[in-house]
Design a protein with these regions (language model features):
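Positively charged, amphipathic and often flexible ligand-engagement surfaces
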Residues: 1-167
């Protein structure tokens, strides 16, 4: 949440332009573009880039996808907000759902910087939010593209059941 320096702002503008160009090429080629998730302290900038390009290039279908790490406590709500934003602004949401990959690093940084860990307290909570995210996406499948990034058998079977029920 620190203010960027002038040099950092200039660099971020270059990143925005590069992501725009890549998104534009993906749209022209009719190929999906998956923007990967990172650590919580840099994720807001990535989310902003993904949202901006989804709004521009996902008018007819999902081309640009953001990655939602459901091992974070706040990401189910963020997914719901993104879906609402897509509905309100007339764009399809591209959602790649994953559990997450930075658990130890996130917890260590939270201790070091003295803030609450953004990571779910238990694996069961991660599983719960992952499955709730699947349900949210399938219920809104008419305005979504979904990539379910999981090896979890229960979640895969749950997704199959949801698709039978809603899609």
């Amino acid at each position: 949440n620190e203010k960027l320096t002038d040099a950092e702002t200039k660099e971020y503008e270059k990143v925005k332009q590069r992501v725009y160009q890549i998104s534009k090429e993906a749209h022209t080629a009719n190929q999906p573009l998956f923007i990967d998730a990172e650590e919580s302290w840099i994720q807001p900038a990535i989310d902003a880039l993904a949202d901006e390009n989804m709004a521009l290039f996902n008018k007819e279908k999902a081309i640009v996808y953001n990655t939602f790490q459901l091992y974070r406590k706040d990401r189910l709500d963020f997914l719901k907000q993104t879906i609402a934003k897509g509905k309100a602004n007339g764009f399809h949401v591209g959602a790649k759902l994953v559990r997450g990959a930075y658990m130890e690093k996130e917890r260590a940084r939270a201790i070091e910087k003295n803030y609450p860990s953004p990571i779910q307290d238990t694996k069961e909570n991660s599983d719960r939010d992952y499955n709730l995210a699947l349900e949210e996406c399938v219920k809104n499948i008419d305005m979504m593209g979904l990539c379910a990034g999981t090896h979890n058998e229960k979640s895969s079977l749950y997704l199959a059941d949801l698709l039978t029920k809603y899609a």
